[in-house]
């Protein structure tokens, strides 16, 4: 999508459709009064009849005839004016994008009926553009024939502002939205790739491409080196698949040369059948999404590089496939991790924590200032929080607070769960240093307790995105498939710094 920022009166734009963001019960602004005159009172009639009052997600479309240069005008409700809500604005823009697609609009304009209260214009524009970009995502690369039922996507968007002095800031906000939207789309694309295409090497090759595109450095450890280094937990999970594992490392250096990096670790199980502890067949097709943590890390690295954030980052992705076979690891096995600690395997479907154990240990070699891991780790997280929030655990309250704040801003919300020492007894083994599952009670917490044993001596947070990484039905902001969760969260966190 091409996005152009300009300073001109909104109602003078010649376009297929002019979108106007309208705040709830604020339908009497000068711009809307001018529009009502051009529409011969049609807007006023709609307001009087309560057909449109500017509530979040409301839309109202007018055919303008000869009254305006724009062929159509679309009003989109943005919710409360006095307490402008970024989530409501993002969803309002997404609903607008849905109407544009239904109308087969290829070029549109976007303006606000008035500047928001308590929110910078630049932030408002960024959020609206994010909503349009997220709503315009489509995964159609495997369609071999043109689908007439799929409407065209918006090709050109004109952002209209009234104040010439805001032009530079708004243009920068649009660029921020573009880089973030691209990062989310990258993450969604990776999650949506089918398992027959998405091997560990596929992820490694995509990381190499990303490094070339974004000016990152990339290192890929292949099986022989993983064996030589002693990645016993990662290799155990991978041994059931004919497709060998990879450990992928991406580095971004935007901060001072002597600044310690923030390590981002993303679970990269490209397909998870459960291994010998086989999952039920129903919805197993969705387990191509078990690398959504890796996808989020890739997307965040892309966005951070595009935004030229002044930080140093290292991304670590253990990439494996978990399948049953004659060579697969078994319940009852005892494996030795990269840390040297031994793990009794009780369930081969608790594989994510095993590969993360080695990845977290490896992260310590970079002497990070903090580590954040993201993983579709436990079904128990969905039972606890549903699909509205991800679970967060941390060994530092300040890091947890910063992440929760970023979750509110990005609307990729987090809920902190406890990590008390008393949970450790559930993963205590009598024949090894620990076991890989603590049973059904507090399953999300005991998985985090397991990971904590492998964390370097630094601030750490674990984010369980099992309930938020996949959209089962489709919404205005996201079609069915991968959500790209984590990208906006991480960028908001980094921008806080």
UniProtKB/Swiss-Prot annotation:
The keyword Iron-sulfur does not apply. Its main location: cytoplasm. Transmembrane segments: none annotated. It is found in: Cytoplasm. One of its GO terms (molecular function) is manganese ion binding. It catalyses: Release of an N-terminal amino acid, Xaa-|-Yaa-, in which Xaa is preferably Leu, but may be other amino acids including Pro although not Arg or Lys, and Yaa may be Pro. Amino acid amides and methyl esters are also readily hydrolyzed, but rates on arylamides are exceedingly low; Release of an N-terminal amino acid, preferentially leucine, but not glutamic or aspartic acids. The keyword Protease applies. Keywords: Aminopeptidase, Cytoplasm, Hydrolase, Manganese, Metal-binding, Protease. Its cofactor is Mn(2+). Mn(2+) 2 binds at residues 267, 272, 290, 351. One of its GO terms (cellular component) is cytoplasm. Binds 2 manganese ions per subunit. Its EC number is 3.4.11.1, 3.4.11.10. It is an enzyme of class 3 (hydrolase). Belongs to the peptidase M17 family. Presumably involved in the processing and regular turnover of intracellular proteins. Catalyzes the removal of unsubstituted N-terminal amino acids from various peptides. This is Probable cytosol aminopeptidase. It comes from Syntrophotalea carbinolica (strain DSM 2380 / NBRC 103641 / GraBd1) (Pelobacter carbinolicus). The gene is pepA.
């Amino acid at each position: 999508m091409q996005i152009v920022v300009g300073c001109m009166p909104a109602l003078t734009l010649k376009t297929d459709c002019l979108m106007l963001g309208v705040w709830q019960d604020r339908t009497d602004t000068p711009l809307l009064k001018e529009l009502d005159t051009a529409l011969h009172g049609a807007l006023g009639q709609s307001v009087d009849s309560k057909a449109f009052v500017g509530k979040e997600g409301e839309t109202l479309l007018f055919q303008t005839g000869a009254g305006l240069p724009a062929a159509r005008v679309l009003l989109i409700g943005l919710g409360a004016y006095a307490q402008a809500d970024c989530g409501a604005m993002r969803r309002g823009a997404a609903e607008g994008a849905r109407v544009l697609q239904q109308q087969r609009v290829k070029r549109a304009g976007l303006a606000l009926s008035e500047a928001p209260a308590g929110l910078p214009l630049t932030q408002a524009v960024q959020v609206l553009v994010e909503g349009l970009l997220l709503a315009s995502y489509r995964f159609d690369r495997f369609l071999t024939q043109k689908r007439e039922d799929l409407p065209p996507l918006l090709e050109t968007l004109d952002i209209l502002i009234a104040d010439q002095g805001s032009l530079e800031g708004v243009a920068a906000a649009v660029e921020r939205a573009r880089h973030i939207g691209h990062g989310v789309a990258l993450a969604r694309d990776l999650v949506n790739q089918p398992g027959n295409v998405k091997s560990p090497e596929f992820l490694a090759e995509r990381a190499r491409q990303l490094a070339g595109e974004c000016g990152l450095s990339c290192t890929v450890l292949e099986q022989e080196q993983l064996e030589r280094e002693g990645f016993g937990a990662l290799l155990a999970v991978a041994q059931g698949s004919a497709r060998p594992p990879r450990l992928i490392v991406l580095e971004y250096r935007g901060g001072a040369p002597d600044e310690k990096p923030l390590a981002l670790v993303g679970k990269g199980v490209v397909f998870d059948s459960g291994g010998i502890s086989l999952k039920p067949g129903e919805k197993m097709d969705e387990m191509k999404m078990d690398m959504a943590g890796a996808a989020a890390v890739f997307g965040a690295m892309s966005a951070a590089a595009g935004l030229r954030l002044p930080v140093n980052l290292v991304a670590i992705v253990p990439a494996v496939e978990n399948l049953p076979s004659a060579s697969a690891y078994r319940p009852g096995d005892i494996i030795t991790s990269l840390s040297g600690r031994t793990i009794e395997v009780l369930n081969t479907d608790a594989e994510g924590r095993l590969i993360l154990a080695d990845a977290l240990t490896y992260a310590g070699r970079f002497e990070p200032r903090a580590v954040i891991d993201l993983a579709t780790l436990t079904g128990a997280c969905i039972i606890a929080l549903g699909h509205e929030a991800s679970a967060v655990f941390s060994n530092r309250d300040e890091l947890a607070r910063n992440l929760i704040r970023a979750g509110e801003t990005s609307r990729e919300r987090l809920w902190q769960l406890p990590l008390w020492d008393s949970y450790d007894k559930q993963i205590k083994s009598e024949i090894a240093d620990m076991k890989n599952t603590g049973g059904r009670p507090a399953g999300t917490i005991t998985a985090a307790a397991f990971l904590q044993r492998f964390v370097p001596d630094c601030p750490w947070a674990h984010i369980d995105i099992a309930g938020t990484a996949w959209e089962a039905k489709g919404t205005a902001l996201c079609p069915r498939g991968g959500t790209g969760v984590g990208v906006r969260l991480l960028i908001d966190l980094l921008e806080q710094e």
